[in-house]
A protein has these predicted regions:
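Short linear motifs at protein or domain termini
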Residues: 1-90
Length: 90
């Protein structure tokens, strides 16, 4: 239960930053960076990335990290993506 909330918190924070333009297409981040920033375990950061991947916002690449995808790859009809767009500065 706690892990699910942590996963949601990380996914929501990173997703909002991607949709808000803080991360640009092609930008990369590593799991260890997410772990350090949010103070979470590797499994929590992996699950958060899986959520973002399922929405088309990022793609994981071995030895490269997590790459932000262009907006054309996003599932813009997903409720979470719509929510992040409405909350964002744009």
């Amino acid at each position: 239960m706690v892990q699910e909330r942590l996963t949601s918190t990380v996914a929501n924070a990173v997703g909002a930053r991607i949709v808000g333009g803080e991360f640009r297409p092609g930008d990369s981040m590593r799991l260890d960076e997410l772990e350090a920033e949010f103070g979470v375990s590797r499994s929590v950061s992996r699950e958060a990335v899986k959520i973002l991947e399922s929405l088309g916002l990022v793609r994981s690449r071995r030895r490269v990290g997590v790459i932000v995808q262009p907006m054309g790859e996003w599932n813009v009809m997903a409720p979470q993506v719509i929510q992040w767009q409405l909350q964002g500065p744009n």
